């Protein structure tokens, strides 16, 4: 367990640098390429009438897009969160912040997260680690501190066993996660009835996971499947110990691909599902919505854009929205509810996955 506050801050900066400038993406794909939306040549709608708006966690979004929680806890992270907040305010989208543990243990870092509320009144999602409720004995007061820090509309609890076991300073005790059931229930009764999101960090959730998360009481699941950023790959660049590098290389492609994770979760869970992990454009978003997601979250492309300024973040997100609307036009969907009902086929590896796991 990390006890040194500065060590957490340094790790935050290392993660920003490595994700921005090194090849940290999976070699395998999200399997979204195995989904084909059925083209409607007689689409029968006016492109200019297409509406992408949704309501999520009590907030209206102009499109089903959230910038995933990525960072905080360092002065550079403060600038990134500022740029993202300005961009989502401009476009009417939502955002999350990175793990707030750094500010939980060091109040001096709170402003690297709270700055988002200086620039956006839109949906903001907090972020805490599931493992810390076990190893650090966190309780409802920690959740309330994280929520108050950024006036959060929802709170994500991230599950990252692979990242923890590869990190030299990782926490390895994920036993007794059902402790979260009592904590979430107590928080909603004693503090605020706020939505709780179970969030992966790149390895996806299985149907078995989804059943556990449902029983614990999570209102939403952010699948964050494999095919995007590999945190094992990040550690290959970060750590100096050769044995840890070797292990990170072995598990660099571990995880459930995003599309497969969505099907897994949707097979047993009827709450809100967020598609994420390697989302690289509006067509990916359209596919996720078509197979059952309520919205999508995007991370790495936005992190890279944010280093160039908030205007660059706007450009990337605008391109995603434009691509989403084109996909909707081509399947004849005037709004997101109609997109959820659009026809598609599943082929290749994803079809095989579904036949073995879900039939």
Curated annotation (Swiss-Prot):
Claim: NADP is one of the keywords in the record: yes
Under Enzyme Commission nomenclature, its number is 5.3.3.2
Q: What does the record say about activity regulation?
A: Inhibited by 3,4-epoxy-3-methylbutyl diphosphate (EIPP).
Q: Which GO molecular function entries does the Swiss-Prot or TrEMBL record give?
A: FMN binding; isopentenyl-diphosphate delta-isomerase activity; magnesium ion binding; NADPH binding; oxidoreductase activity
**InterPro entries registered for this protein in UniProt:** Aldolase_TIM, FMN-dep_DH, IPdP_isomerase
Which GO terms of type biological process are on file?
isoprenoid biosynthetic process
Group of enzyme by EC: isomerase
Q: Where does substrate bind?
A: 11-12, 99-101, 163
pH dependence comment: Optimum pH is between 7 and 7.2.
**Reactions catalysed according to its record:** isopentenyl diphosphate = dimethylallyl diphosphate
Q: How does activity depend on temperature?
A: Optimum temperature is between 85 and 95 degrees Celsius.
* Cellular component terms (Gene Ontology): cytoplasm
| Cell compartments where the protein resides | Cytoplasm
Kindly list the cofactors needed.
Answer: FMN; NADPH; Mg(2+)
Q: Does the keyword Metal-binding apply?
A: yes
- What are the UniProt keywords, alphabetically? Cytoplasm, Flavoprotein, FMN, Isomerase, Isoprene biosynthesis, Magnesium, Metal-binding, NADP
Residue positions binding Mg(2+): 164
Indicate which residues the UniProt annotation says bind FMN: 68-71, 99, 127, 199, 229, 278-280, 299-300
Self-association or partners: how does it assemble?
Answer: Homooctamer. Dimer of tetramers.
**Function in brief:** Involved in the biosynthesis of isoprenoids. Catalyzes the 1,3-allylic rearrangement of the homoallylic substrate isopentenyl (IPP) to its allylic isomer, dimethylallyl diphosphate (DMAPP).
Tell me the protein family, please: Belongs to the IPP isomerase type 2 family.
Name listed for the protein in its UniProt record: Isopentenyl-diphosphate delta-isomerase
